[in-house]
């Protein structure tokens, strides 16, 4: 099913005054597509809109018709890697070319960033979504499972530190260590944006695991309502480790963080192309809640390789 270009809508920077409406459209669009009895309840008290706009207002775009917001899209940059979403349009304006018009400015932004890898996460069961993104050179590769497990509230002995505890004068050095570790996994991969956003907005914390002075794993975690996790949950938005053993320790540390904050559920994304990490998560009790597919531009592998110990999902 193709979008017909019935409306040529102005697309520009999403304004702070429009964030409440962007959030409403986001919930209504996804809730309607998924067939929820009350679509506006989609995602509960999790926040995917204001948090991303606050992290980088220049990477948030809105489509406007008769001066009213009808859709929005967000770009995220992790150093040499960029992805977009959530891309949502008010349901009364579906199939009229608005989603297509919200993708163009994002791709222009990717080009200005000079990133080497671009992608998105979408519904694996929707031919309409797959076809839309294929028109822009994105191709479906491996499934990504959004997995969760109950948090063990028992005593955790994993030794880890938190970014929030790093003295201000040492944070640049800490971010440099994070950059060095992720760059070794994929050239130019850099999570500074996410680490800073979580800290500045008080969305959770970043777990850091060290071997002496060498960083061996990190996990950027959203915790509770108002973050991308929602009530009673800790969501590992991005986690990476140098080895299988340090990956296990990272998952322990993230669970310990969740327990310390009184949260009952640990959530993380597992890409099937990273089968070793996927299998370790399954062995540890993670189970799939739902799954989508990552679409990558030029059909490139990126860091979704069997030798990488990463959790993320690009939602």
Which residue ranges define each predicted feature?
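Conserved active-site tyrosine of GNAT-family acetyltransferases
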Residues: 129-134, 138, 279-283
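A short, well-structured alpha-helix characteristic of acyl/acetyltransferase catalytic modules
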Residues: 1-6, 15-32, 154-159, 168-182, ...
């Amino acid at each position: 099913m193709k979008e017909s270009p019935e409306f040529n809508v102005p697309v520009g920077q999403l304004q702070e005054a429009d964030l409440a409406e962007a959030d409403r459209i986001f919930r209504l669009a996804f809730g309607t597509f998924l067939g929820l009895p009350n679509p506006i309840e989609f995602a509960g008290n999790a926040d995917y809109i204001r948090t991303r706009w606050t992290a980088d207002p220049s990477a948030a775009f809105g489509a406007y018709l008769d001066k009213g917001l009808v859709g929005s899209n967000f770009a995220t940059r992790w150093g040499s890697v960029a992805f977009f979403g959530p891309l949502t349009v008010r349901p009364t304006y579906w199939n009229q070319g608005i989603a297509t018009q919200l993708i163009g400015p994002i791709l222009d932004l990717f080009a200005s960033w000079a990133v080497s890898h671009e992608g998105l996460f979408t519904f694996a069961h929707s031919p309409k979504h797959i076809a839309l993104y294929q028109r822009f050179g994105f191709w479906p590769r491996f499934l990504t499972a959004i997995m969760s497990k109950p948090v063990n509230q028992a005593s955790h002995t994993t030794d880890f530190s938190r970014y929030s505890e790093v003295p201000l004068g040492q944070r640049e050095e800490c971010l440099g260590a994070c950059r060095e570790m992720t760059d070794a996994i994929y050239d130019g991969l850099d999570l500074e944006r996410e680490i800073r956003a979580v800290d500045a907005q008080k969305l959770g914390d970043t777990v850091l695991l060290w071997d002496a002075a060498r960083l061996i794993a990190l996990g950027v975690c959203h915790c509770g309502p108002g973050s991308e996790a929602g009530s009673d949950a800790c969501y590992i938005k991005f986690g990476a480790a140098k080895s299988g053993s340090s990956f296990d320790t990272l998952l322990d540390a993230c669970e310990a963080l969740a327990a310390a904050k009184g949260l009952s559920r640990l959530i993380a994304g597992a890409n099937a192309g990273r089968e070793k990490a996927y299998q370790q998560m399954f062995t540890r009790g993670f189970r799939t809640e739902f799954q989508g597919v990552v679409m990558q531009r030029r059909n490139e592998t990126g860091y979704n390789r069997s030798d990488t110990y990463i959790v993320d999902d690009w939602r």
